[in-house]
């Protein structure tokens, strides 16, 4: 990934992000904002405005311009969303956040239906994994109704409170921006989620069955291309 950004890693001769665009379009999401940083031009030059993929794409660069050069500068996943919203309110309805380097076949329509049925402001999609694998992931702890209570980041197997893991797929309502400060680094997992739990906001885990391959993990990538 020194020369190729993760969303551009090829699977069956297509960048992984192209599969995500197809999934989004299939479920009626055609307005897409891509938060770019590392090798941003590789992504923008390939996908452009999204027209040939049946969607509309806009880009937000996570960093600054110095002497005409784009300098990547992480402001966190939530910080990136907030900057987009502060610049021009893009998120005016229920929206979905995906990682650009995961291959999934999630039923997004059903996920959004369940999110709304819960009356959630924020939902995260969880997936059950074999108990001996929990130490590779962030574990989600909920009450019987699915309301998120806490997280364990890569716990030891015997200390894990559950076998439900955070897949990095989120559904939000625009009200979530009330919990994200402007102009400072802020991460969805490390900062926003604990804040939502502390505030008692309607924040739920939605367990779903689907294929999920993390292209950022080398064994998962080999599994995908086979």
Where are these regions (language model features)?
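A short, conserved acidic/glycine-rich loop-to-beta-strand motif
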Residues: 118-128
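Extracellular disulfide-bonded cysteine-rich modules/repeats
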Residues: 138-140
């Amino acid at each position: 990934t020194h020369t190729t950004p993760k969303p551009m890693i090829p699977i069956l001769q297509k960048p992984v992000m192209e599969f995500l665009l197809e999934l989004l379009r299939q479920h009626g999401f055609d307005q897409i904002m891509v938060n770019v940083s590392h090798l941003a031009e590789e992504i923008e030059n390939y996908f452009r405005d999204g027209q040939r993929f049946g969607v509309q794409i806009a880009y937000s660069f996570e960093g600054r311009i110095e002497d005409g050069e784009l300098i990547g500068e992480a402001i966190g996943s939530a910080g990136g969303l907030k900057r987009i919203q502060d610049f021009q309110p893009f998120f005016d309805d229920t929206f979905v956040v995906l990682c650009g380097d995961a291959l999934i076949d999630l039923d997004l329509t059903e996920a959004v239906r369940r999110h709304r049925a819960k009356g959630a402001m924020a939902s995260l999609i969880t997936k059950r994994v074999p108990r001996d694998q929990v130490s590779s992931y962030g574990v989600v702890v909920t009450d019987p109704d699915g309301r998120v209570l806490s997280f364990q980041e890569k716990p030891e197997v015997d200390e894990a409170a559950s076998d439900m893991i955070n897949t990095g797929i989120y559904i939000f309502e625009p009200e979530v921006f009330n919990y994200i400060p402007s102009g400072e680094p802020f991460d969805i997992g490390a900062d926003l989620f604990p804040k939502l739990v502390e505030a008692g906001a309607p924040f739920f885990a939605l367990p779903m069955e689907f294929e999920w391959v993390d292209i950022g993990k080398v064994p998962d990538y080999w599994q995908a291309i086979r």
